[in-house]
Amino acid sequence: ELRGQNKYASLLDTCQEASIFFYNKGIVDLSVRVNRGEMQTRQFEPNGRLQEMQVKGRIGSVRWTVNQADSALFYGLAMDGTEGVILDNFSLRGSSGLSLRTIPSEMLKEFNMQRPYDLIILQYGLNVAA
């Protein structure tokens, strides 16, 4: 279960949109429970593209359940607001960044269609710079 928090900064205890991103070659059946409420279930047929299931509202907690996933790759989750700066973190500690070259450009384009980026910052640790 993912939950907002308020230990480090204010206004992080809730979000307005929560999403899960995946690619599937077979049927995927997902359920989501927002704020410990009723379960919402949706089924996705394969379409050869990055897919997203999204819920909206005042979200303090969200629990995703994969009920069925035939040949599926799950890429990540997002909990976002509807205004301000949104930060995505792809943690690659100890990496020189060469692994980024192995991500197919078509997949990067599909992510950019789902989550349009205005700025990308690459950060590397001291162990790579040394």
What residues fall within each predicted segment?
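Conserved SGNH/GDSL esterase-like catalytic core that processes O-acyl groups on lipids
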Residues: 1-33, 37-130
